[in-house]
C-alpha cells in the first residue's frame, strides 16, 4: 500500500498541562513521522547546548509550535506520522494559545482525541480535579462531535510500572469519561512512557502484566498492545462528499487577467468547474469557471481540499471572507435571521444574560451576535432541561440560547453541516463559551444578483 493510498485521519491531543502531551506527540512524530533526520539532529544539538537533552521529543514539538506561533509556515509534514493503515495529522495540541478556538473553527474536525493522563502520584489527581483542564478538553471534544477517544496513561515509569496504579487510574478515568458522554468499553486504555518510548510503538518489556487493550464498538471488537495499535484501530471517518456543497470563504482575491478568485476549504460536497454557485449571505449567484489547488487545475474539489476558484461577473466587493458558497441547485446556503444553539459557558468572570453581544467565530465568519433569549438551562451531559427561561447563566452552565447576528451571517444546524454548526464565543480576548447550533431561521430574501454567466450556464 503506497503512502498516497492511505486514508487520512486527524487527531487532537488533550490533557492537563503537565501530562506529557508534547513529549508523547513529539515521540510519535519523531519515530513514525515526517521529520527528516537532518532536522532532528539540528534540534538535538540545540537541545544539548541548552542542557535540555532529556527534553528531546518535547523540544521537537516546541520548536514546531514556536515557529507556528511566529507565523512561520511550517511544512505540515512535520505534524504528520504514519501508522500501518493511516496517514495521521495532529491538528492541534493544546497549550497552543488559541487551542479552543482552533478546535471549533479549526481547519478540520478531529476524527479521534487522545487523552493523555499522567500516572504520577498527585499528578493524576490534579489533572482530573473539578477545575482541571482535562475535564474541559474532554467535554469540548465530545460536544464538538469527536466521538472516538483513546486514553494514554503516561509517565508509567515514574510509578515503577505499577499494575495496581494503572488499574486504579482506569477505574477513575472510566467514570470520568462516562460523565462526559463517552462509553469506556469503546475506549482503549494504554500504559505508556512518552519519554522512554515504552508501549508507544513496540510493546514494552517493563510491564509484563499488561495483556493489551480491548475496545468494543458498533462495528465490532478490536485489541492491541501499543498506542500506535490503538491509533491504527480508529474507525475510518466518512467524508461528506454526498452532502450539498458548503465552502466557507477564507479570502477573496482579485487576480489580474483572471478576475475574482474566492479561496476556502470544501467542508461538504464537491465543487466543479461549470457549476452554478450561490454565495450566502450576500445572495450572489454565478458560474464557477475553474477550480485549482496548489496552482493545479482540478476537475473537482472534495471535502478537506483548500481550493481557489474563479468566478465570472462578480467583483471583490460582492463576496467576502465569512461568506459561504454552495450549489445553487442543491440546498443553496442562505443568510439567517436568528438561530438556536446549545451554548456552554467555559470561563466568563460574571453572569451572562439576555442582551449579551459578544463576537462569534463560526467557520470563517467573525460576527457579533446577541443572546436575545435564554430559552432553557440544560444538563451538559444528558441535554435534558433543568430550568426554563433562566435569568442568567455562568461558567460551567449549558443553555439553549436564541442568537441574533448583528449583520448577515450564514450558519447551519450542526447535525446537517457540522463545520458550519459549531462556534466559539470570544470576549475579553479569550474563548468564553462554545456553541453547537440546533436550528436556524433562514432569511428568505427575494432573488439576489444572478450574473449573466450563471444565466447562460443554467440554460445549457
From Swiss-Prot:
**Binding-site residues, GTP:** 15-22, 92-96, 154-157
PROSITE patterns reported in the protein's UniProt record: G_TR_1 (PS00301), G_TR_2 (PS51722)
Q: Where is this region: G5?
A: 193-195
Where found? Answer: Cytoplasm
Identify residues that carry N6,N6-dimethyllysine: 3, 317
- By its UniProt entry, which Pfam families does this protein fall under? GTP-eEF1A_C (PF22594), GTP_EFTU (PF00009), GTP_EFTU_D2 (PF03144)
Q: Which Gene Ontology MF annotations are present?
A: GTP binding; GTPase activity; translation elongation factor activity
Domain tr-type G, residue spans? 6-241
The segments labelled G4 in the record are 154-157
State the family named in the UniProt similarity comment for this chain: Belongs to the TRAFAC class translation factor GTPase superfamily. Classic translation factor GTPase family. EF-Tu/EF-1A subfamily.
Q: What is this protein called?
A: Elongation factor 1-alpha
Which gene codes for it? Answer: TEF
Amino acid at each position: 500500500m503506497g503512502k498516497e493510498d492511505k486514508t487520512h485521519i486527524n487527531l487532537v491531543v488533550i490533557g492537563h498541562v503537565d501530562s506529557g502531551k508534547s513529549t508523547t506527540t513529539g515521540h510519535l512524530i519523531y519515530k513514525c513521522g515526517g521529520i527528516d533526520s537532518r532536522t532532528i539532529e539540528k534540534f538535538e544539538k540545540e537541545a544539548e547546548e541548552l542542557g535540555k537533552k532529556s527534553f528531546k521529543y518535547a523540544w521537537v514539538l516546541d520548536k514546531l509550535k514556536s515557529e507556528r506561533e511566529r507565523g512561520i509556515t511550517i511544512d505540515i509534514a512535520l505534524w504528520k506520522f504514519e501508522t500501518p493503515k493511516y496517514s495521521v495529522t495532529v491538528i492541534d495540541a493544546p497549550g497552543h494559545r488559541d487551542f479552543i478556538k482552533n478546535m471549533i473553527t479549526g481547519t478540520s474536525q478531529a476524527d479521534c482525541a487522545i487523552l493523555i493522563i499522567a500516572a504520577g502520584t498527585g499528578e493524576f489527581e490534579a489533572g482530573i480535579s473539578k477545575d482541571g483542564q482535562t475535564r474541559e478538553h474532554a467535554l469540548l471534544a465530545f460536544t464538538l462531535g469527536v466521538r472516538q477517544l483513546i486514553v494514554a496513561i503516561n509517565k508509567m515509569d515514574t510509578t515503577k510500572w505499577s499494575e495496581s496504579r494503572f488499574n486504579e487510574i482506569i477505574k477513575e478515568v472510566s467514570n470520568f469519561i462516562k460523565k462526559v458522554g463517552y462509553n469506556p468499553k469503546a475506549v482503549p486504555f494504554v500504559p505508556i512512557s512518552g519519554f522512554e518510548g515504552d508501549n508507544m510503538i513496540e510493546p514494552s518489556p517493563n510491564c509484563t502484566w499488561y495483556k493489551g487493550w480491548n475496545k468494543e464498538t458498533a462495528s465490532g471488537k478490536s485489541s492491541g498492545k501499543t498506542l500506535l495499535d490503538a491509533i491504527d484501530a480508529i474507525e475510518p471517518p466518512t467524508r461528506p462528499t454526498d452532502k450539498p456543497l458548503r465552502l466557507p470563504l477564507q479570502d477573496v482575491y482579485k487576480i489580474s487577467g483572471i478576475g475574482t478568485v474566492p479561496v476556502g476549504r470544501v467542508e461538504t460536497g464537491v465543487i466543479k468547474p461549470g457549476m452554478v454557485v450561490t454565495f450566502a449571505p450576500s445572495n450572489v449567484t454565478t458560474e464557477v469557471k475553474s477550480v485549482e489547488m496548489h496552482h493545479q487545475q482540478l476537475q473537482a474539489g472534495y471535502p478537506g481540499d483548500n481550493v481557489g476558484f474563479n468566478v465570472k461577473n462578480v467583483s471583490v466587493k460582492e463576496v467576502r471572507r465569512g461568506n459561504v458558497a454552495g450549489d445553487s441547485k442543491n440546498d443553496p446556503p442562505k443568510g439567517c435571521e436568528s438561530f438556536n444553539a446549545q451554548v456552554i459557558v467555559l470561563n466568563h468572570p460574571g453572569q451572562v444574560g439576555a442582551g449579551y453581544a459578544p463576537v462569534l467565530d463560526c467557520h470563517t465568519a467573525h460576527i457579533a451576535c446577541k443572546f436575545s433569549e435564554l430559552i432553557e438551562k440544560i444538563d451538559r451531559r444528558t441535554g435534558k432541561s433543568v430550568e426554563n427561561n433562566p435569568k442568567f447563566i455562568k461558567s460551567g452552565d449549558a443553555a439553549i440560547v436564541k442568537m441574533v447576528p448583528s449583520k448577515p451571517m450564514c450558519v447551519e444546524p450542526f447535525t446537517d453541516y457540522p463545520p458550519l454548526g459549531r462556534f466559539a464565543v470570544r470576549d475579553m480576548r479569550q474563548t468564553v463559551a462554545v456553541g453547537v447550533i440546533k436550528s436556524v431561521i433562514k432569511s428568505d430574501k427575494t432573488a439576489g444578483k444572478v450574473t449573466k454567466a450563471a444565466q447562460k450556464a443554467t440554460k445549457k
